[in-house]
């Protein structure tokens, strides 16, 4: 398996807790040998309000919020154009119902634009719509402090490696949990800042060039997740 794909990455233009710019992210992932990069910026009340650093200055209209959110994704796509790095869409949803983060893959912009209640809807309704549309629903860093682990039957899988150097994600426990309940295992760098080095993702026999292809590969198990069960050296956020 020789193609490397990042599944968890944020950029400063959208995620309120990120400081790594889209341009830096693209160049860093090319430098470190990745073929595909999923941008999974936070979709949360903080994204569209006052967080650590307010970036959204629009109104309450959902389409206005989505314009802001997807402008960030399109910026990464434009920067990576002709640079031999596939840029694909994922979303890290922060649900108002439980405060947890969730990674969603396999869906397009229209799905999110057509679901203005996604932040407040009961989680079972969100998962149902994701699955009906052909997507997958994962819990990242499920054993990090303040996170509430969800019932395995609700999830397609979990992150068994989260590479954020500012948090103890207890990847060893996550790996054992995934084994115990037969969950798909993800690996992601959880890139936020320039002092982070890409350290997560999956290896595949072919390059991943579409969101739907990722879903097929994950369901088939035809991938190798990087650093499963290992913990990065924790420094600071």
For each predicted feature, which ranges?
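General beta-strand structural signal in soluble alpha/beta enzymes
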Residues: 39, 87-89, 139-140, 185-187
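Glycine-rich tight-turn/loop motif centered on a GG-T
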Residues: 58-63, 110-116, 161
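Binuclear metal-dependent hydrolase catalytic cores centered on His/Asp/Glu-rich metal-binding motifs
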Residues: 100-134
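Surface-exposed amphipathic alpha-helices with a cationic face
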Residues: 4, 30, 77-81, 122-138, ...
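Short, charged beta->alpha transition segments
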Residues: 90-91, 123-126, 140-148
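An N-terminally biased module of ancient metal coordination in phosphate/nucleic-acid-related enzymes
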Residues: 1-89, 94-96, 153, 195-196
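Residues that cap or flank secondary-structure elements
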Residues: 16-17, 68, 117-118, 166, ...
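Charged catalytic cores and adjacent phosphate/nucleic-acid-binding surfaces used
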Residues: 1-7, 11, 21-27, 48, ...
């Amino acid at each position: 398996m020789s193609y490397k794909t990042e599944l968890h990455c944020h950029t400063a233009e959208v995620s309120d807790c990120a400081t790594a710019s889209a341009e830096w992210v693209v160049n860093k992932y090319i430098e470190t040998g990745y073929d595909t990069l999923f941008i999974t910026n936070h979709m949360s009340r903080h994204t569209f309000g006052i967080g650590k650093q307010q970036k959204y200055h629009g109104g309450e209209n959902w389409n206005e919020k989505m314009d802001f959110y997807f402008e960030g994704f399109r910026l990464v796509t434009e920067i990576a154009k002709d640079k031999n790095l596939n840029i694909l869409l994922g979303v890290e949803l922060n649900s108002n119902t439980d405060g947890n983060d969730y990674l969603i893959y396999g869906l397009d912009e229209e799905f999110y634009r057509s679901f203005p209640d996604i932040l407040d809807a009961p989680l079972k309704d969100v998962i149902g719509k994701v699955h009906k549309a052909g997507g997958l629903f994962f819990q990242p860093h499920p054993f990090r402090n303040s996170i509430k682990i969800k019932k395995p039957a609700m999830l397609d899988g979990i992150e068994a490696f989260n590479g954020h150097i500012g948090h103890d994600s207890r990847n060893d426990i996550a790996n054992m949990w995934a084994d115990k309940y037969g969950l798909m295992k993800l690996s992601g760098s959880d890139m936020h800042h320039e002092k982070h080095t890409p350290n997560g993702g999956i290896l595949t026999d072919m390059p991943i060039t579409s969101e739907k292809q990722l879903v097929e590969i994950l369901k088939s198990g035809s991938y190798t997740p990087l650093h499963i069960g290992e913990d990065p050296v924790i420094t600071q956020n």
